[in-house]
Amino acid sequence: HFSPAYPLSEEELASWGFSNVEELGLFVEDPYSKGKYHPLIGGEQTLAFNHLSHSAQESYRHLHHYYFYQRHNDFWYSNAMKKLQQLIASTNMLTCGEDLGMLNESVTRCMNNLKILSLELQIMPKELGVGLGNPATYPYLSVCTTSTHDCPTMRMWLGERNGTGDATPQECSATIATNMAAPSMLAILPLQDWLSIDGSLRKGDAATERINDPGNPNHYWRYRMHITIEEMIAASGFNEKVKELASRQ
């Protein structure tokens, strides 16, 4: 169950039609609050659920959705506001949030109210039904990037989209240019994505530039820069390209 959490009292459960809660096998008692309960995360897949009447099953489904997707919104929001305001006030640094993927609405509400910068990534757009985000629509209070440590590099996802498994330096330059022109306050791009604009500097195999694949336990944080800092500094053509792209507004 969630922790911290806002468990249900026996009276609340009774209002949903559930009594003798401990005998049902569909709830777990809160370890810190006796007489208060949490619905099982996978309750609908249990034999106990199958033994319920049709109306009780519908009630449990509604309760399950309410508990996991609605009940905690304000609870988490108030806790986050209380803690994050103190943390933000303790430093002069900009505060940025990693808000990619599925989010509870309270996360976005809290970040907006505290002016915490969001993270914007084209391959993980925040708009429903959109396959690829448009950097031109990013909010000012955001950090724009082309990839992260836990996702494919820009070369990789561009290659997946064009069907070749890789992207040319020209395609990479164009994508970076689009991101650098975004309204975001900051643009912070991984080194691999910058190197991808130069065919002589980037690695031959795009897949070897990925930092981490969360779905593969044998692939973790093993990327190492394949050229020295001195070699990169000496690459005048590359540095001119970076300078030109970084000046985009």
Describe every region a protein language model picked out.
Residues 1-249:
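Catalytic cores of glycan-processing enzymes that make or break glycosidic bonds
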